[in-house]
Amino acid sequence: MKIQHIIHENQLGLLFQQGSFGLEKESQRVTADGAIVTTPHPAVFGNRRYHPYIQTDFAESQLELITPPTKKLEDTFRWLSVIHEVVQRSLPEEEYIFPLSMPAGLPAEEQIRVAQLDNPEDVAYREYLVKIYGKNKQMVSGIHYNFQLSPDLITRLFRLQNEYQSAVDFQNDLYLKMAKNFLRYQWILLYLLAATPTVESAYFKDGSPLAKGQFVRSLRSSQYGYVNDPEINVSFDSVEKYVESLEHWVSTGKLIAEKEFYSNVRLRGAKKAREFLTTGIQYLEFRLFDLNPFEIYGISLKDAKFIHVFALFMIWMDHTADQEEVELGKARLAEVAFEHPLEKTAYAVEGELVLLELLSMLEQIGAEPELFEIVKEKLTQFTDPSKTVAGRLVRAIEQAGSDQQLGAQLAQQYKAQAFERFYALSAFDNMELSTQALLFDVIQKGIHTEILDENDQFLCLKYGDHIEYVKNGNMTSHDSYISPLIMENKVVTKKVLQKAGFNVPQSVEFTSLEKAVASYALFENRAVVIKPKSTNYGLGITIFQQGVQNREDFAKALEIAFREDKEVMVEDYLVGTEYRFFVLGDETLAVLLRVPANVVGDSVHSVAELVAMKNDHPLRGDGSRTPLKKIALGEIEQLQLKEQGLTIDSIPAKDQLVQLRANSNISTGGDSIDMTDEMHESYKQLAVGITKAMGAAVCGVDLIIPDLKQPATPNLTSWGVIEANFNPMMMMHIFPYAGKSRRLTQNVIKMLFPELE
């Protein structure tokens, strides 16, 4: 099968580079010193019966992290990053993810528990593996790389060739060519990427075959790794022979099931191999790869891209390896696996030749410049083995003292990195924090997640056959269409609440700046709030707590409000403290005191300097990707300073509280303090009633309350509603400035999927 001519003549180079990718990464859970734990798989990850992202491989201690299929490797790595961060932050404080493939700190065999799965057949299969291979070999971890050619490419190639009549036969032979050539040249990938040079002597039943201080390239890929008995030989000459030989070994009892065949290439896309004859091979799984301990996720994006183009070259080349050449490739793999990592391989000339031809392919298919650089970098490693992963690893182990010590150091380092921005998912940092928090929780619980529109924060969540759509973290089908429209319009909100019998402050609405300013006399010396009719997140709001003192400030506040909307409200200011109630369904789940943006004087620094110092806090940022927002020093803040007789250059006295905003929104630099347990129950019930009046399932209700300990009475002096908000912020409740965290995203999930275990 010769396809490079078809690709070149029909300008299919770009389509040739497309495909689908998925990674499966195995890792041991360990203690701080690198010893494998004997604890059960953490219950926080839900049930392994259905979890699409977090599974266990052989043992309870052996995590398997699985990315969903993606069209771009960059997206595959985003998912791998997110799943890692979820796992790292969910593990017990004293547990870590071991970054090396070969196990260290092995417990006694009787302490190693096979994965305790719901399906008895899955447990029985693992118990069978124990009898055949022993437990220690099963504790080896690695990376499985799943790759599917673009179905459009396969269709185009089939139409443009004249050798095959059957599309299934063509597809099978295309993938089989990739598999056979991969097995022939797999030693190249092992030489460059192997990372299992040693293992503790306890791993071996009959003593270590390694001399003291001896290092090799890959124990995992050697006869001492996770391999079948040499007697078991499955033919790759054709799909028919592959199926027949695999079924033969199962029928004779040499393999308990087809999945026990541990080839470095596995044909995928069917439950039974025989199905390939009618439905075709759908993708390949490459199982060769050791964990790269120098990469936080066990593999680098550059190496994943190299593997991709290497796999493409396996079908680009005109030659197709036969079974004899496949066996030669296996023998060469075993030989290279036992070479010293700092010595040149005996087959360097062949390796260099293959990569030079690979570079030629990249040129002909119009590959990105980055791919040329990646391959050229690999090419240099044939003359300098110290640059290979195994070469680097040997030196790192010698420096650390042992593989276990190195693994422990890196495990602690990688866990610390996962907590640097503990409130965010680094790969989806462009999404708002509430959506990131929801993503964290659904991935943790095992709900299948599809990001429909990243910029619009739109998710599709699936549990079994149950599908829910979520926008902005808590906007769902449980809300009526009209409810956000009511809450968006502050005038309508007040009228609806007033009709429902809730206390609302009196207000006057204006549609022109001139008329509003001309009404100054109505509000002189009155404490008022000036705000746009339709707003959220505190935009355009000015509060005169001490009363309107002059026309100029009044006009300025109106001007700011009119920038946000064509209609503005001037509302009576209610005396008391403002609290945000987060309501979901029939329950107030969280109550927050939002302290307006402020700084505290120290008799040394100016207001501007104090603001800059407070803004340095790691939780402060743009407010959408951080739990707290940096404090601004704009027109509204300077008006607030003026009310206090200050400017940005004033130096406040020690412990002097300087208010920079009167409104308490976190989105304008405020501080968040959880008050859920302190708030009297009567106000929580009021918030639920207000939410129902809005026709909402989820609502952020803002109440002014003079005394949160006293029960509510019908009077406006007891409490008043100033706003009801659709899509209320959750992050300020999840990560408050002070007080107890309320993980509201979990409540959203319970609302959407009440059947979830």
UniProtKB/Swiss-Prot annotation:
Residues where ATP binds: 521-580
Top EC class for this record: ligase
Keyword Transmembrane helix appears in the UniProt entry: no
EC number per UniProt: 6.3.2.2, 6.3.2.3
Positions annotated to bind Mn(2+) 1: D702, E723
InterPro entries per the UniProt record, alphabetical: ATP-grasp (IPR011761), Dala_Dala_lig_C (IPR011095), Gln_synth/guanido_kin_cat_dom (IPR014746), Glu_cys_ligase (IPR007370), Glut_biosynth (IPR006335), Glut_cys_ligase (IPR006334), GshAB_ATP-grasp (IPR040657)
Domain ATP-grasp: 494-753
Pfam family, one: Dala_Dala_lig_C
Protein name (record): Glutathione biosynthesis bifunctional protein GshAB
Organism from which the protein derives: Pasteurella multocida (strain Pm70)
